[in-house]
């Protein structure tokens, strides 16, 4: 908060200074309102109306100026079009160069306008959050309800922007035409290879994507990864040196993600048979599957902490732990030991390096391609989820070699052990440890000149100075600071413990984590008990279960394409969120076996509805979570990705425990006994969503 006032002054265009939101005034007003309410001199309702009116005026000033500038840019483009048509009739190479540069000048001015809108959008978000911190969502409920959803809302004009696409399209198309015309005057040896897209147009598109939180398929996938970044970071200010970025290392992290998801789901179709072959009940499959998740609850924390110092060593440890765990899982059959089986799965869970994979993308991949890397992380997870059961369906062979048995129960362990061994070799050969921040700093210090050091120290000193002067006379234009605000260092300081991270969770964040828990719980119930339920009601074989689970996994990417490319462009995220929750509720409700004999169509259709809706819900849920979560949770050990991972892993643990406990009621009652908690949690999440609906923006 404190840092943003100076950031706004530093980044704003001087000629446009009168059209930026008056962040300092609104911040002072918030403090003044708090004092008035505490003193009893002002009613909260009057405060809401007064501040809403002031914010409306600020937004109106910004929007009208934005539209005015767009009109000026459009007028310049219209005049350039006349010159363009004249050049097409009488080609002149010098005039083509001039016209291209004129179009680029318009593009640069449009880029400045987009940065203007972006600064105002960030300021609005921050002042809304500040008001929420002071008054507990009363203002957000009121303002968002009465402004954001209005058909003539100027608030949406700021966040969504209007008419920019037409200007960008005109600049891009005309530059492309001029490039083609220019090429006709040169031989192939004189004309250098032109880029696929003009750098100015590419910069504009990047600014548009950043401003609008573009909801295309790639970004929608990236939101699943919950790899957060600061609002104030731009590609030009990205601190990650692209020369130190290593593609093979990123590929190895994505490979780790893929193999771990395969490892998680490859045993699901055969876990009940394996349990019975060792003398346990079929429903013990819940413990077998869930033991990996139990270990992951703890491994996520130490892997996240370990990634503060190294990325290579945690990945090596992960590979070794998973290799040993899968060997133990495979050998449990010949040892006739359920304990060895469970210990093997626990060992696999201790090798869960998803926190490292997320952290590597967040900290070591340049901002320019971070969205693609995040989408790759989600795609690798989805592909692994589909490949696991499919691979289990292919391993329907049985033979014995020396003293070791190879069958449908043990082969998943043997195959994954070999896979992790090959991965470990590849890791040792190809992975390159990135430079840490301290190493980068030392390297930069050796290279920068004395004047650079002086200038850098001045900038850093200016950023560290408090905005409230504590001695002497305070200038009138100096920003005011109050006790509720964090210092610049604290506002970017990561949380150092789960308790500190929990204190940063607002009601909206807690509700989103509850929703994430609910959807992971429901999906785990559906997947983990599928082999037990289908064998009891329909006498399905392992191959049939594997095909069913693989088909469910294969729906992930198509559904994300549909939602990310189309549905999310037509509806708000919170509308999709609530609708998806209701559909999950209906899917759970239709899955119950109550009055009529249970049939395959009922099970498959209800399961498909529940799974697909949960996948849609996950993407939207994590998208909203990344927006409402504190920026202090974007980095460090106890980050937003770790919190969501822990919530999802805990849900899987509870779900698998529910399956095992439900088994004591008998296989005939297992279905309803496990669906009932899912139904209750789903209803609770819907109610919680309705209570915080107006704060989800």
From Swiss-Prot:
Q: Which residues cross the membrane?
A: 247-267, 278-298, 315-335, 337-356, 375-395, 411-431, 513-533, 544-564, 576-596, 604-624, 670-690
Tell me which GO cellular component terms the UniProt record holds: membrane
Question: Which residue ranges does the record annotate as region Disordered?
Answer: 439-459
Matches recorded under InterPro entries: MFS, MFS_Domain-Containing_Protein, MFS_trans_sf, SPX_dom, SPXM_SPX_plant
Q: Where is the SPX domain?
A: 2-145
Gene Ontology molecular functions = transmembrane transporter activity
How does the protein's chain sit in the membrane according to the entry?
Answer: Multi-pass membrane protein
Q: Which UniProt keywords apply?
A: Membrane, Transmembrane, Transmembrane helix
Q: What is its main location?
A: membrane
Instruction: Name the Gene3D superfamilies for this protein.
Output: MFS general substrate transporter like domains (1.20.1250.20)
Kindly list the places in or outside the cell where this protein is found, as annotated in its UniProt entry.
Membrane
The lineage's top-level taxon is Eukaryota
Q: Which family does it belong to?
A: Belongs to the major facilitator superfamily.
UniProt name for this protein: SPX domain-containing membrane protein At1g63010
Origin species: Arabidopsis thaliana
């Amino acid at each position: 908060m404190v840092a943003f006032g100076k950031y706004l002054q530093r980044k704003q265009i001087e000629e446009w200074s009168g059209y930026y939101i008056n962040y300092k005034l609104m911040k002072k007003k918030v403090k003044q309102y708090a004092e008035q309410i505490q003193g009893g001199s002002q009613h909260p309702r009057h405060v809401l109306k007064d501040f809403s009116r002031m914010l409306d005026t600020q937004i109106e000033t910004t929007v009208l100026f934005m539209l005015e500038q767009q009109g000026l840019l459009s007028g310049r483009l219209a005049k350039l079009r006349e010159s363009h048509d004249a050049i097409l009739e009488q080609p002149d190479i010098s005039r083509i160069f001039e016209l291209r540069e004129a179009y680029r000048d318009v593009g640069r001015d449009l880029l400045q306008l987009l940065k203007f809108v972006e600064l105002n959008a960030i300021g609005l978000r921050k002042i809304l959050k500040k008001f929420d911190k002071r008054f507990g969502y009363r203002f957000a409920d009121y303002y968002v309800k009465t402004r954001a959803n209005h058909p003539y809302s100027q608030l949406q004009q700021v966040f969504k922007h209007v008419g920019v696409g037409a200007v960008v399209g005109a600049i891009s198309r005309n530059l492309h035409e001029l490039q083609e015309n220019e090429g006709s005057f040169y031989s192939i040896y004189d004309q250098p290879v032109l880029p696929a897209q003009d750098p100015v147009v590419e910069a504009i598109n990047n600014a548009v994507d950043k401003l609008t939180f573009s909801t295309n398929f790639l970004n929608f996938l990236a939101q699943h990864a919950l790899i957060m970044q600061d609002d104030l970071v731009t590609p030009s200010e990205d601190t990650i040196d692209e020369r130190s970025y290593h593609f093979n290392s990123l590929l190895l992290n994505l490979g780790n993600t893929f193999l771990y998801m395969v490892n998680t789901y490859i045993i699901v179709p055969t876990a009940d048979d394996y349990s019975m072959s060792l003398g346990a009940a079929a429903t013990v499959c819940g413990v077998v599957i869930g033991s990996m998740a139990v270990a992951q609850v703890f491994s996520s924390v130490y892997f996240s902490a370990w990634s503060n110092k190294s990325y290579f060593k945690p990945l090596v440890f992960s590979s070794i732990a998973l290799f040993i765990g899968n060997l133990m899982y495979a050998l449990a059959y010949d040892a006739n030991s359920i304990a060895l089986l469970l210990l093997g799965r626990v060992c696999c869970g201790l090798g869960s390096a998803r926190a490292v994979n997320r952290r590597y993308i967040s900290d070591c991949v340049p901002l320019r391609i971070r969205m693609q890397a995040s989408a790759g992380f989600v795609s690798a997870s989805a592909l692994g989820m589909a490949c696991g059961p499919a691979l289990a369906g292919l391993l329907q062979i049985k033979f014995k070699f020396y003293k070791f048995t190879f069958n449908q129960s043990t082969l998943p362990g043997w195959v994954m052990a070999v896979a992790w061994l090959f991965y470990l070799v590849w890791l040792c050969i190809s992975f390159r440890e990135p430079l840490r921040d301290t190493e980068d700093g030392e390297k930069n210090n050796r290279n920068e000149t004395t004047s650079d050091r002086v200038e850098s120290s001045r900038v850093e000193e200016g950023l560290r100075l408090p905005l409230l002067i504590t001695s002497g006379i305070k200038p009138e234009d100096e920003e005011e600071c109050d006790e509720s605000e964090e210092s610049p260092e604290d506002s970017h300081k990561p949380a150092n413990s789960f308790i500190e991270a929990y204190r940063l969770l607002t009601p909206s964040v807690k509700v989103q984590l509850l929703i994430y828990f609910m959807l992971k719980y429901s999906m785990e119930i559906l997947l983990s008990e599928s082999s037990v339920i289908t064998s009891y009601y329909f006498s399905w074989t392992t191959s049939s279960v594997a095909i069913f689970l693989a088909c469910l996994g294969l729906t992930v990417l198509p559904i994300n394409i549909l939602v990310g490319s189309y549905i999310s462009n037509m509806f708000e995220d919170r509308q999709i969120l609530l609708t998806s929750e209701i559909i999950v509720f209906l899917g759970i409700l239709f899955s119950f076996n109550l009055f009529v004999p249970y049939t395959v169509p009922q099970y498959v259709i209800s399961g498909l509805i529940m799974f697909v809706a949960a996948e849609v819900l996950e993407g939207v849920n994590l998208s909203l979570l990344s927006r409402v979560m504190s920026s202090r949770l974007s980095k460090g050990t106890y980050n937003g990705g770790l919190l969501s991972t822990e919530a999802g892993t805990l849900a899987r643990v509870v779900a698998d425990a529910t399956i095992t406990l439900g088994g004591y009621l008998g296989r005939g009652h297992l279905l309803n006994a496990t669906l009932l908690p899912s139904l209750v949690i789903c209803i609770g999440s819907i109610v919680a969503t309705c209570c915080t609906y107006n704060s989800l923006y």
